[in-house]
């Protein structure tokens, strides 16, 4: 069932048909980690951002989270536009992670073609500033395109998409706040 996001008049909440997708949330199984993401589990089609400074463990935490999901039967992937698959595989080996799919890709359309083909339940994109498109866009237009494309495709494919953002060493956010305000 498609989730309706258009405006409507008032209706009693008890009269609204709840899409079955809301009953397909899934958790990592680690209480503290699940609490970081709201405690209710990941809703297929949702998107989220994770922003932190360099060297704070974003990649480590998210790869370990994907491994937990793999162990529970979910199909996951970590896509880096910055690190080679050898670097990602080395990180996975160091962490004892064996089941997570890894790729080095930067073109957003290619990434989501692969997401669709592989039927991933969750994909992490590392990182927003390194993503590109087949369109000839730059700056704010590129950010708007990426933001809309990611959130639309996540919902269409019912795949949870996590996007890594960066803070500078001084603690300021790198980039606009467009994407953090667009995700679920």
Q: Where are these predicted regions, by residue range?
A:
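The Walker A/P-loop phosphate-binding site
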Residues: 2-98, 111-117
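Flexible beta-alpha connector loops of hexameric P-loop NTPases
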Residues: 100-105, 132-144
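Loop/turn-to-beta-strand initiation segments
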Residues: 75, 119-122, 156-163
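Short acidic loop-to-helix transition motifs that present clustered carboxylates
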Residues: 84-85, 105-111, 168-172
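Catalytic P-loop NTPase motifs of RecA-like helicase/translocase cores
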Residues: 131-132, 170
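Phosphate-binding/switch region of NTP-binding enzymes
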Residues: 144, 148-184
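Walker B catalytic acidic pair
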Residues: 126-128, 166
